[in-house]
Amino acid sequence: MADTIHWADVIAEDVLKKSGKHLVATGITPSGNIHIGNMREVVTADAVYRALSNKGANADFIYIADNYDPLRKVYPFLPESYVEHVGKPISEIPCPCGNCANYAEHFLKPFLEALRRLGINPQVYRADEMYKTGKYTEAIKTALVKRDAIAKILEEVSGKTVAADWSPFNPRCNQCGKITTTKVTGFDLEAETVDYVCACGHSGIVPMAGGGKLTWRVDWPARWSVLGVTVEPFGKDHASKGGSYDTGKRIVREIFGHEPPYPIVYEWIMLGKQGAMSSSTGVVISISDMLEIIPPEVLRYLIIRTKPEKHIQFDPGQPLLTLVDEYERLRTQFRENDPSLGTFQKRVYELSRATGICQSEIPFKQMVTIYQVARGDFAQILKIVKRSGFSTEDKKCIKELADNVSKWLKLYAPPFAKFKVKEKVPVQAATLSELQRAFLSAFAALIESRGEISGEEYHMLVYSAKDEGSELNRKIAEKLNTHAPQVDPRELFKAIYFSLLGQKSGPKAGWFLSSFDKEFLVERFEEASNYSPEKQA
C-alpha cells in the first residue's frame, strides 16, 4: 500500500479523461443533526476537488443544502407539535430552538460552521432559493412535458409501477403548505404555472418558480443538468440496482440532454457496535459535537485514509486514542521526511491537512495528562505545556486542543484514562514496600539536584534504577543500607502512581511527571516515602 496512488488522485485522473470545466457537487438534507456519517460525503468531495486542483484542472466545488425537501415525520428529537408540519418543506417550518430563520437553518448553521473548521469551503447553494429564483423552471417544464417518458424510465429501471396520477412535480399547497399531499391537474408552460388539488381539500395554482419541487428521482438529474455537475459522491443506498443513480443516469441523458456525473459511491461510517449512523434512528454523533472532541485534521484523516467503498468503524472511546496516535505518528514522519513513508501515506497526510486548521504540536494523549494535572485551569495548562518543551505562542490552538480533551474526558474517555491528583499523600501510600519508599526518597533527592527534566528523561531515570552502578541504584542502596538492590521498574512506577493518584497505574509516566512542578514532586515523594497512617492521625 505504501506506494499506491491515493484514491482521490485515481478518481481525479479518471475524471480528467473528459476535458472541460468540472464541478464537484455534494448535497445533504438538513432534516436533523448532520453527523459524521454525512461528513464522509463532503470530505470525500473535498479530497477529489483538491486532487483535481492539484492537477491543474478547471474545477469548482459546491454544496447543495436540500432544504426544500419535506419533513418526513416527527423525529424522536422533535416535540409532537411538529406533526402539523409533516409534509411541508423544511425551509418553511419553524426552527426548533426559535433562534434560526427556519427548521433547516437550525441544523444547517452548525454544519456549515463545522465545514469551516474542517477547512472545507464549497460554494453553498440552498435548494429553496434555487427553486424560488427560477433556476429549476426550465427543468420543471421539460419534466412536466415529458412526464410519460420519465415514468417509463422509472418503471423500466426500478421495476416499480408508476401511478397513473403521478407527476414529476410536487406542488406546494397554498392552504396547508404541504408538498406531499398534492396532485398535479394541469400546467401552463407560457404562464409557468401548475394547477393542483390537495388532500386537505384545497385546489389552486402555483408558480413553477418556488411553488413546489421536483420529486427526488427527477430533482437529482435535473440538478446535474442545471448546474453542470460532473463529479458527485453519494451513499451506497443511491447506488443500488434500480436505485436513484440508475434512474438518474437515464433521465439526465434522455430527458435533460446532459451526461451523468462521475459517481463516487461511499460506504457507511459505523458507530461502535451500534451500526450505521442515521439521524432518523438516533444512532448519531453530530459533526459539531464530534469537533468538540476530536481535532479537525484527525477527523479528516479518519475519512481520507480509507477508500470510499469501504466502511469505516468509528468509536469515540478508547479507539479514538489509537486513531489520534496514528495521525500524529504520520505527521511526525512527514515532517521529518521519513524515508519509510510511502507515496500513499504522504498523500493521506497532505489531504488530511487544510488551510485554517489548528496544527497543535502537543500529542492528544499528552494533553489528556496535562489537562487533568492542571485540573482544567488554562493558565496552569500553559505553564505545563511550556515546561514540557512546547511553544505557547499559539494559545488559540492550545485552547482548542484542551477543549477537545475536556469534552472527550467528560463524554467518552474510558475509566483508565481518567485520574485525579490527590491534594495530600493518598492513604494507599501506607502499602508501599521498603524498596518503594527508598526509591521515592532517592528519586526525590536526585531530581532535586538536577535542572529541568523532560518526560523522556524522567522515564529513563526511573528505569536506570535497575542498573547496578547507576546513580539512582546507588542512592536506593544507601537508603536501604545494602549493596546493589534488585529493582523491578514496574514496582517503582506503582510507587509513583500511589504517591500522586492513590492507584497502582496511571498515564504514561514520563509525560505525567514532566507535567508537575519539580518542587511539588520532591516534596510529595519525600512525604510518601515516610508516610504512615499514625503520623496522619
From Swiss-Prot:
One of its GO terms (cellular component) is cytoplasm. Pfam families: tRNA-synt_1f (PF01921). It comes from the Archaea. InterPro entries: aa-tRNA-synth_I_codon-bd_sub2 (IPR020751), aa-tRNA-synth_I_CS (IPR001412), aa_tRNA-synth_I_cd-bd_sf (IPR008925), Lys-tRNA-ligase (IPR002904), Lys-tRNA-ligase_SC_fold (IPR042078), Rossmann-like_a/b/a_fold (IPR014729). It is an enzyme of class 6 (ligase). It catalyses: tRNA(Lys) + L-lysine + ATP = L-lysyl-tRNA(Lys) + AMP + diphosphate. Its main location: cytoplasm. Its EC number is 6.1.1.6. GO terms for biological process: lysyl-tRNA aminoacylation. Keywords: Aminoacyl-tRNA synthetase, ATP-binding, Cytoplasm, Ligase, Nucleotide-binding, Protein biosynthesis. The keyword Protein biosynthesis applies. SUPFAM superfamilies: An anticodon-binding domain of class I aminoacyl-tRNA synthetases, Nucleotidylyl transferase. Gene3D superfamilies: 1.10.10.350, 1.10.10.770, HUPs, Lysine tRNA ligase, stem contact fold domain. GO terms for molecular function: ATP binding; lysine-tRNA ligase activity; tRNA binding. A motif ('KMSKS' region) lies at residues 276-280. A motif ('HIGH' region) lies at residues 30-38. The keyword Aminoacyl-tRNA synthetase applies. It is found in: Cytoplasm. Belongs to the class-I aminoacyl-tRNA synthetase family. HAMAP family: Lys_tRNA_synth_class1. NCBIfam families: lysS_arch. This is Lysine--tRNA ligase.
